[in-house]
């Protein structure tokens, strides 16, 4: 139980906050076309050397992790140069599992890192033919009128917990040249509903079409 003394101790705790990464506000990697994105992410951010020690855990907050391109190609490599013990990436949005995220250039599911992580886990656990069966069911489902379409793609995600997919995303984002431990933490759908009880739409998180391509 929390008493006055323990509450005071909790409230007196202050995490150290530094401007470790500096971003050029004029450059936007999310809305850049696929051909130029990888090159652009190399130039968007810079870091403040000496802001953390090698024994520090570094926590960074992102509004969402969609493709994971900027994290993998730029941010993690850049922050790793500061030699933190661990980098924790906190996403205020849940895992984005389906296309048309925010309506911006998201027509291909394989662009989504959550989907790619689920596919990797699925291939480790099941036969390749099982994934092919789901694909065929999706193609068949797409012949129906929109009001009759069922979400077959969930069969790829259902065998795994959110945490298992998050751990796989963490492994995918950590390249061999990253020496720090990397952990990715996502907001949950349940807690998002608590934070935003009257949302306009969560379709890119929970209610997709069945297209795999």
Where are these regions (language model features)?
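Conserved small/polar residues in nucleotide/adenosyl-binding loops
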Residues: 203-209
